Amino acid sequence: MASNNVGRVTQILGAVVDVQFDGELPFIQNALQTRIGDRTLILEVAQELGERTVRAIAMDSTDGLVRGAEVEDLGRPITVPVGPGTLGRILNVIGEPIDERGPVDAKKTYSIHREAPSFEEQAASAEILVTGIKVVDLLAPYLKGGKIGLFGGAGVGKTVLIQELINNIAKAHGGVSVFAGVGERTREGNDLYHEMIDAGVIKLGENTTEGSKVALVYGQMNEPPGARARVALSGLSIAEYFRDEEGQDVLFFVDNIFRFTQAGAEVSALLGRIPSAVGYQPTLATDMGALQERITSTKKGSITSVQAIYVPADDLTDPAPATSFAHLDATTVLNRAISEKGIYPAVDPLDSTSRSLDPRIVGEEHYKVARDVQRILQTYKSLQDIIAILGMDELSEEDKLTVARARKIERFMSQPFHVAEVFTGSPGVFVSIEDTVRSFKEIVEGKHDDLPEAAFLMVGTIEDARKKAEALKAKA
């Protein structure tokens, strides 16, 4: 172990630092350590330039670092503490606690760069993960041990949806959850921490967090690109410990995978690589694969991951979201046109897909209802041009009925969220899969053609829609 191998800083380019060693060069991905005043700065070796110099990425701000400063090779990659001691704590990319509650009580550390499980170790599941969110459970159901992506542009509700999933799944789920905040708002990270304390998912005692169910790993928007490009790996290492050593079913939430790619592009440019399409790093697919292939279920335990993925300029063909599509089992696409109608969650029922929408997994009835709902919505979509030009009166009676049902279905896909109660004033609802399938089946069959459209907006089950219709009638 080359722990006493010491070099000197020769060049500083923002987040990228060149270090010259007289002796042996450190390996790629090794951690280097230097002091800036009274703080320690960790760097990660990214390139070897010539015989004596390495180029490293800083995991924190390089303000105050000077040429000639001593840099020590730690002889190993960056490691993070793992195990029950991380639960209830907030860590940064290098595993240091940032919640001002003292050191982390961990018996073990894991490298943030680990091999993905081999083909023989992997295991597949065909069990549905119930989210309590109607549009998701009906049209693009999630699998236990699967990978789920929430795609959406700026401000269409990805973070609120991921927080609702944490609320509905993590609280009901007996196991452990890990949340990686990658390049998102610090305020949201803080809010999430306090919400989890209020919900009892994090239990804060005197110098202890015993009984907590979630570990938080943050590298937020204000961090340098090195930290944002690695923090998802740090969170994943903590999740892998619970999967591999304790055989648990772990929930792994990432907000936001796009920021991981964005940070990779920033670092890549600083390292002098020639960018590929739209200015992304040439190693985009490799970087994404290295992260995503580790998020999987094995014979020992499972990792179910929910990843928010920002879509730049609402363009799903942008290389960053397009690369992540290939790795996912279910995609929930949020659409600005739907959010503009005031329908939340703004999930696009025709764009969202799931591998598990299969009669062998969800059952014949669920599959048929989901396909009928999609057919009605697709017909409505294709009729919209005619309606815009000629108006509703020019449609056949059958088409008029289809449009009326489609508009009701569209509104019925909205529902009040628990985490949005403070904004909406409506109490959140959790709808079981049975109620979801039954309610949509009744709308498709025309049993509720007599109800006004407004009755279907922001309700839970079809019974709630009936009650709302009566209340609207009484008001009128």
From Swiss-Prot:
GO cellular-component term (any): proton-transporting ATP synthase complex
The protein's enzyme class: translocase
SMART domains named in the record: AAA
Reaction catalyzed: ATP + H2O + 4 H(+)(in) = ADP + phosphate + 5 H(+)(out)
Residues spanning the membrane: none
Entries under InterPro entries matching the protein: AAA+_ATPase, ATP-synt_VA_C, ATP_synth_F1_bsu, ATPase_a/bsu_AS, ATPase_alpha/beta_chains, ATPase_F1/V1/A1_a/bsu_N, ATPase_F1/V1/A1_a/bsu_N_sf, ATPase_F1/V1/A1_a/bsu_nucl-bd
Chain sites annotated for binding ATP: G152, G153, A154, G155, V156, G157, K158, T159
EC number(s) from the headed UniProt entry: 7.1.2.2
GO molecular function, one term: ATP hydrolysis activity
CDD domains for the chain: ATP-synt_F1_beta_C, ATP-synt_F1_beta_N, F1-ATPase_beta_CD
Location(s) in or outside the cell: Cell inner membrane
Keywords for the protein's UniProt record, in alphabetical order: ATP synthesis, ATP-binding, Cell inner membrane, Cell membrane, CF(1), Hydrogen ion transport, Ion transport, Membrane, Nucleotide-binding, Translocase, Transport
Membrane topology: Peripheral membrane protein
Subunit text: F-type ATPases have 2 components, CF(1) - the catalytic core - and CF(0) - the membrane proton channel. CF(1) has five subunits: alpha(3), beta(3), gamma(1), delta(1), epsilon(1). CF(0) has three main subunits: a(1), b(2) and c(9-12). The alpha and beta chains form an alternating ring which encloses part of the gamma chain. CF(1) is attached to CF(0) by a central stalk formed by the gamma and epsilon chains, while a peripheral stalk is formed by the delta and b chains.
Family named by the database record: Belongs to the ATPase alpha/beta chains family.
Protein name (Swiss-Prot/TrEMBL): ATP synthase subunit beta
Organism listed in the record: Granulibacter bethesdensis (strain ATCC BAA-1260 / CGDNIH1)
